[in-house]
Amino acid sequence: MVTTVADDMFTGDAISDPYSYYGKLRDEDPVHWNELYELWVVTGHDDLVWMTRHHELFSSEFWKRDQRSPYPAIDESDMGLYQFMREFFMDWFIQHDRPVHTDQRKVVHKWFNPNSMELWRPMVRSVIKDCLDEADASGHMDVMRDFATPLPLFVIAQMMGMPHYDRKFIRSMAEKLLFIGRGETDRMQPLTEAIKEFIEYLTPLVEEKAAKPVDENDLLSVLASGEKTGALTRDEVVADAILLLLAGHETTINLICNGTLAFTQHPEQWKILKEGRLEEPDAITRATEECLRYDPPVKSIQRVASVDAELGGKLIREGDRIRWFISSANRDPKKHDNPDTFDISRWPNTHVAFGSGIHHCLGATLARLEGQEAFKALAERYDNIKVETNEFEYQPSITFRSLKTLPVSLT
């Protein structure tokens, strides 16, 4: 079937309203060959989950296996920067398949188990209190700048033993790294600048941690221990430290910001949350899961076909690029009743905001904890959160669903 949807995923309409764009694809051509960018676009829930469960067919080693030019095209003069970026991303543990991925993930996997994460809940609450106390002084805040960003940034920096005065630097570098999912022709410039500055910043810290006995309370120390066991090289330790710093706060930023916006647009759901009228699991747990489903922090993930494989009646050739869209799968009517409705009573909530299979998000428990505490605090403090704009501008990324600002008044 030939779809009637335009193939440019980077248009303003597709960025601002991915649910209409990819929803139409899902309805018309759920495994769609995008002719413009020469890749498969997968939009259905069951197809996405099937792919994650068949990792032997669809490789995570995208940067290693894919030798073609980037999409959209970049400035020809920046191809050297593109190769530098590719080689760097190859060192991330999420860019490996089994057994390498399993061995490398094991280095820090235990650190993120639910019991370990619970130990951080008091600190999360303390940071939230500080943020909201400051907002109370004026009765206004930019949710993105004043709440959603400082909370998870503080937490991951503390977990990794980063000096508090370096948080601003970490965030500025993370913002440059996020150009990876954007379409500007000159995007390699800020992206590679951030990689180089991050490497320069983290290398001496990793050297310091590696020279000492492992400190189980320090995530960077635990990560550095992977070099001693042979699971990681020094370059991989540094690269994974950058990954953890980035992924350790960006997903939660978008969860909190997108979720807050959803509640302002659905006052009846805000009332249910405040009144706690839901049975087990409680309203906060249900609300956080529905925020993750309704407007997920990550829109899409890319893979490359390891072998010829059939999906949705289409033949995917070895080496083909594939991009699956979480944002569409989470609104699939074949999986969710009334999928375009924000309903915090929805349970069970079988969204795929954190992926599925062996590459399920390592930090999912942490993101959930931070989201739960953020929404709980907002509901306990405020009767009304009113958005002070009618225009919502999103970062032009097909990877992340990220608002630029969210100004609100608080009463």
List the predicted regions and their residue ranges.
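Cytochrome P450
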Residues: M1-T411
